[in-house]
Swiss-Prot record:
Belongs to the ATPase gamma chain family. GO terms for molecular function: ATP binding; proton-transporting ATP synthase activity, rotational mechanism. It is found in: Cell inner membrane. It comes from the Bacteria. This is ATP synthase gamma chain. Produces ATP from ADP in the presence of a proton gradient across the membrane. The gamma chain is believed to be important in regulating ATPase activity and the flow of protons through the CF(0) complex. Pfam families: ATP-synt. Keywords: ATP synthesis, Cell inner membrane, Cell membrane, CF(1), Hydrogen ion transport, Ion transport, Membrane, Transport. PANTHER family: ATP SYNTHASE GAMMA CHAIN (PTHR11693), ATP SYNTHASE SUBUNIT GAMMA, MITOCHONDRIAL (PTHR11693:SF22). CDD domains: F1-ATPase_gamma (cd12151). InterPro entries: ATP_synth_F1_ATPase_gsu, ATP_synth_F1_gsu, ATP_synth_F1_gsu_CS. The gene is atpG. The keyword Acyltransferase does not apply.
Amino acid sequence: MAGAKEIRTKIASVKSTQKITKAMEMVAASKMRKTQERMSSSRPYSETIRNVISHVSKATIGYKHPFLVDREVKKVGMIVVSTDRGLCGGLNVNLFKTVLNEMKEWKEKDVSVQLSLIGSKSINFFQSLGIKILTQDSGIGDTPSVEQLIGSVNSMIDAYKKGEVDVVYLVYNKFINTMSQKPVLEKLIPLPELDNDELGERKQVWDYIYEPDAKVLLDNLLVRYLESQVYQAAVENLASEQAARMVAMKAATDNAGNLINELQLVYNKARQASITNELNEIVAGAAAI
């Protein structure tokens, strides 16, 4: 059994770690609430612009934008949004498993996959596997902006226009609630067509005159929509990161508390044994006299 002094040192060390994990838990909780607000405020924009695109595309009779037309898939592009930091449980691991499983399915169909990575964790992981990376961005921080993400979006848009990829997917962790975050894979280009229920009550083509031209408007709207989708994914992934970190740090704090209790019992036993030995020595000495 370890000595009382050694056990006291261990207890002090665990208590110090417990303070750090508790502080990290509180910081993550605060950041998660702020990110949730940004996430909620950005969703209506994405949904509305998607509806506008659907109506405008129906107004351009005889014109089909390339982003709205399905192709035969021979090459796939994926924009993968991960975290820049760790200590968030299995969040990134589950995300990477989703990407690798999808890549495996495409490989079995003899389809190549290119990745555009956002977040240092995904960059480090996929570089270590030697997978072809089209673009990479990291360090977006706790308040991501469209300007920080536009490089990944534009690279995939250019690749799609040039025929270097035939379909583009967006992969990120979707925030369900504080205890649940789910890796999702969503089709980004070509855009899935909205059904009548998603369009709402206004199912008819808008009878508007577009200036300068509906095609020009549609081109701009589609790019803005793709940017907003990647931004939304980055914000959702950030909220998922903070929630996962908060849960992980709470578990670490609780485990530290349990370990302290166990060490305290060991310390008490060691101290009791030490006192008992001292008493035995005193009694033995008195008997010898």
